[in-house]
Amino acid sequence: MSRAKRIMKEIQAVKDDPAAHITLEFVSESDIHHLKGTFLGPPGTPYEGGKFVVDIEVPMEYPFKPPKMQFDTKVYHPNISSVTGAICLDILKNAWSPVITLKSALISLQALLQSPEPNDPQDAEVAQHYLRDRESFNKTAALWTRLYASETSNGQKGNVEESDLYGIDHDLIDEFESQGFEKDKIVEVLRRLGVKSLDPNDNNTANRIIEELLK
């Protein structure tokens, strides 16, 4: 089966299964190798209520080589870059098989939202947040879903503060602001160090933060 026929067959299979709430469409009718896929966030996760858009580029060697997929929708997740939408998932790399379809790949991405792999991250900062404070991580991921993936979102953060966007404790920022440091610099350093909150007795981390703020 030619690549074009396979792609058309896969699109029809998605249309024939509306209960899956997955879509697969061409970006342009003149280019059958560039598509957009969508799926819903898994229930019971911080991504519930979101609709996630994935950009799909199908290579000439498909289905013997995997499609290139990345999220158009911003997602707060250990295995998805919070900046570019790049994805760390084995079936899109070395574990790809010709029997995998675009639909099943999207279902695998949906499953990835439900079951992150923080020890094999695409976004190290987010992975550290997930491992250190799951409750705070869930709150931040849910905020991103509301801001970027909900039906009422416009893809912009609006008036949401940068600290909230990355799950950083306000009291921690206030503490360093009281020492005369600028808020933007504090948030930048805390993000770079992967610090979301701080134990009052953790003097080593506090000193490291101050050293970075003074640079």
From Swiss-Prot:
GO biological process: ERAD pathway; protein polyubiquitination; ubiquitin-dependent protein catabolic process; vesicle organization
Positions annotated as active site in the UniProt record: 88
Cited CDD domains: UBA_II_E2_UBC1, UBCc_UBE2K
Enzyme Commission code: 2.3.2.23
InterPro entries reported in the protein's UniProt record: UBA-like_sf, UBA_C_fun, UBQ-conjugat_E2_core, UBQ-conjugating_AS, UBQ-conjugating_enzyme/RWD
GO molecular function, one term: proteasome binding
Induction note: By heat shock and cadmium.
Cross-link (Glycyl lysine isopeptide (Lys-Gly) (interchain with G-Cter in ubiquitin)): 93
Reactions the enzyme catalyzes: S-ubiquitinyl-[E1 ubiquitin-activating enzyme]-L-cysteine + [E2 ubiquitin-conjugating enzyme]-L-cysteine = [E1 ubiquitin-activating enzyme]-L-cysteine + S-ubiquitinyl-[E2 ubiquitin-conjugating enzyme]-L-cysteine
Keyword Signal attributed: no
Top EC class of this enzyme: transferase
Family: Belongs to the ubiquitin-conjugating enzyme family.
Role of this protein: Catalyzes the covalent attachment of ubiquitin to other proteins. Functions in degradation of misfolded or regulated proteins localized in the endoplasmic reticulum (ER) lumen or membrane via the ubiquitin-proteasome system. Cognate E2 conjugating enzyme for the HRD1 ubiquitin ligase complex, which is part of the ERAD-L and ERAD-M pathways responsible for the rapid degradation of soluble lumenal and membrane proteins with misfolded lumenal domains (ERAD-L), or ER-membrane proteins with misfolded transmembrane domains (ERAD-M).
Note: Present with 8940 molecules/cell in log phase SD medium.
Protein name as catalogued: Ubiquitin-conjugating enzyme E2 1
Gene: UBC1
